[in-house]
Amino acid sequence: MGNQFSSGADVVDGAASKDWPSAVYDTAVYPVGTRRVQQADEVNAANSTHYGDREWIFVYNDEASTAFAEGNVIMLDNSDYQPFHGLLSTATIHRHRMLGVAGGALAAGKYGWIIAKGVCEVQCDGGVNQGDRIVSAASG
């Protein structure tokens, strides 16, 4: 599959880097939609309650002035449907419009990584029990 790679080491793009998940860019230094796998040992080292591989996806924050915050559900921008241009989820959406969950802050009009698959915290407006179905909603 094109535009996908595993971090697998502390060297990213020829430079020492452990902070790539939180990096914010002014330009598309990777093609939007690029996927990156963070190995299970790196995921667990960053948060001991997390396990398994985590897949990140490179996106553009298409919000006019609102930054993504850790745990925000990010959906495809439905005003122009530009591939991998994200907005904060403000309604119940079809799963194919959901891009992922913000793993950290990503300023409006900037590029960065969000979590597409794997264990992470998700902002919600109520309790969640094991086996509960999680959906995006207008509040939360």
Give the residues covered by each predicted segment:
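Extracellular receptor-binding modules and their adjoining Ser/Thr/Gly/Asp/Asn-rich linkers
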Residues: 2-140
